Amino acid sequence: MKMNISDKLQERYGKSHLSYSSLKQALGDMAQFDRYMKGELKYQSDALDFGTLYDMLLFEREQAFEKYVVLSDSAIMSRLSDKAKASKKPSMTLEYKSALASMKEEALEEGKTIVSHDDWQMANDMIDRLATCGLLDTYLAGDYQVGFLEELNGIQVKGFLDCLGSNFISDSKSARSAEKFRYAVRDFSYDIQAYIYTKVFGIKDFYWVVQEKTYPYLPALVKCSEQTLFTGEMKFNDAVSRIRKFLTDDYEPTTDYLEYEV
């Protein structure tokens, strides 16, 4: 009798589903998968923070205005003494840094996030470019941030897709290079994401709307090919097999290692 992965996941981690992120971890180090499922693996970077801002302005614009506090230099300067304001570089003074820390703390207490004026402006300028080229009203038109918890190949999968169109699914990505995004699909296993979404919603056409983060913010419409979907399916099955073995054998994850041929 085949082991019920959902039951084992619930028993070990207190949740019975997998996600794109957890499946991606399972393709690498099972110790990382174990940490991710326990909530111990936290990623934070300027790129991730900007991506969150960009997506919220794109798909949940009203919420973005509630969540973010745009930090301007003038707002910080207004809190400084005349002496600090008159210094050669006010931003290098302890008073300036203290005022900045206070503003961040105040935002945190209100459940808000501080964002620089430059990042806020850039995200909005990027979205303006999407509108100008027509992608915003076509391949980013539909229902936004659609959540799901469904069974796929006997496994419970959970996730959120960016945009559910009338006959397509699209996912927004900001990137350094729109042309080189094809390599990111492989390296970050975005193909697994595409496979899960298309299967769960029964929609064949999946697109990435990619946009460069440097001016003039070149956008690209990248269609997911059948070959890429097939690769995503193979990765999905491989990850599930690794997770099944890990849960069945109940081994110490740090004893895990990769084995492959090139």
For the regions a protein language model found, what residue spans apply to each?
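Polybasic (Lys/Arg-rich)
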Residues: 235-262
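Metal-dependent nuclease catalytic cores that hydrolyze phosphodiester bonds in DNA/RNA
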Residues: 1-158, 255-262
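Short cationic/low-complexity microdomains
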Residues: 29, 229-240
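Mg2+/Mn2+-dependent nuclease catalytic core
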Residues: 141-142, 146-234
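Short helix-capping/linker segments at secondary-structure and domain boundaries
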Residues: 60-66, 202-205, 248
